[in-house]
């Protein structure tokens, strides 16, 4: 489990093609400080398992074909910047919300509206996740726990989030251009509520 509070921006330093998979090498000195083989690290909101911890704060992780296709990890190349977070420790503060590290879909940044102190980012989303997104609710965008500040009024095919300076500075979303594909994970509580309501008839 993760919290959506990004610990650092890492950098992809290598990508090796495997059979139906890829092995990524990522530099992240903070998240690798106490990491070992088998630990979980969220990369752009995708839970990956550490294969090896390398010198200079690097680690390797394998990404299967389904994940490469369903998330933006398939677009990563050496030099790409990524959001990194270690799995939450029992008893640690839950600064964001419960994040599983299982991407539900990808969205696309369609507009950025900066102001003096914050910036509103509009993201187009597929219908498969739209029903779980509510105004003032939580959503994970590339591993970042954010609050939905606006929704499309009619078709509900987009939502907006507001970025404070700290989020812009410490995450990749601060520099992501219009047209960038981002990973989306909706609040898992909404999924459970829907399942319970369906079961109740």
UniProtKB/Swiss-Prot annotation:
Sites where the protein binds 2,4-dihydroxypteridine 2: 47-49, 62-67, 101-103, 136
Enzyme class: transferase
Keyword DNA damage: no
The protein's Enzyme Commission number: 2.5.1.9
Database matches in InterPro entries: ATP_synth_asu-like_sf, Lumazine-bd, Lumazine-bd_dom, Riboflavin_synthase-like_b-brl
GO molecular-function term, one example from the UniProt record: riboflavin synthase activity
Amino-acid positions noted as binding 2,4-dihydroxypteridine 1 in the UniProt annotation, renumbered to this chain: 4-6, 145-147, 162-167
Residue stretches spanning the membrane: none
Pathway linked to the protein: Cofactor biosynthesis; riboflavin biosynthesis; riboflavin from 2-hydroxy-3-oxobutyl phosphate and 5-amino-6-(D-ribitylamino)uracil: step 2/2
Record's keyword terms, sorted: Repeat, Riboflavin biosynthesis, Transferase
Lumazine-binding repeat placement: 1-97, 98-197
Catalyzed chemical reaction(s): 2 6,7-dimethyl-8-(1-D-ribityl)lumazine + H(+) = 5-amino-6-(D-ribitylamino)uracil + riboflavin
GO biological process entries: riboflavin biosynthetic process
Subunit structure: Homotrimer.
Function (record text): Catalyzes the dismutation of two molecules of 6,7-dimethyl-8-ribityllumazine, resulting in the formation of riboflavin and 5-amino-6-(D-ribitylamino)uracil.
PANTHER family linked: RIBOFLAVIN SYNTHASE, RIBOFLAVIN SYNTHASE ALPHA CHAIN
Protein known as: Riboflavin synthase
Organism of provenance: Mycobacterium bovis (strain ATCC BAA-935 / AF2122/97)
Gene that produces this protein: ribE
């Amino acid at each position: 489990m993760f919290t959506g509070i990004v610990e650092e921006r890492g950098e992809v330093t290598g990508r090796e093609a495997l059979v139906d998979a890829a092995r990524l090498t990522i530099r992240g000195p903070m998240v690798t400080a106490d990491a070992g083989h088998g630990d979980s690290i969220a990369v752009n909101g995708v839970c990956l398992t550490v294969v090896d911890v390398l010198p200079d704060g690097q680690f390797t992780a394998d990404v299967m074909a389904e994940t490469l296709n369903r998330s933006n990890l398939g677009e990563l190349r050496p030099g790409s910047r990524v959001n990194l977070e270690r799995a939450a420790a029992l008893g640690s503060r839950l600064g964001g919300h419960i994040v599983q590290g299982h991407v539900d879909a990808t969205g696309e940044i369609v507009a950025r509206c900066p102001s003096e102190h914050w910036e509103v980012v509009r993201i187009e989303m597929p219908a498969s996740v739209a029903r779980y997104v509510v105004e003032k609710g939580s959503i994970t965008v590339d591993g970042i726990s954010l609050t939905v500040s606006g929704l499309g009024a009619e078709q509900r095919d987009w939502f907006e989030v507001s970025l404070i300076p700290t989020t812009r500075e410490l995450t990749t979303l601060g520099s992501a251009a219009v047209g960038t594909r981002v990973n989306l994970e909706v609040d898992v509580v909404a999924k459970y509520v829907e399942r319970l309501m369906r079961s109740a008839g």
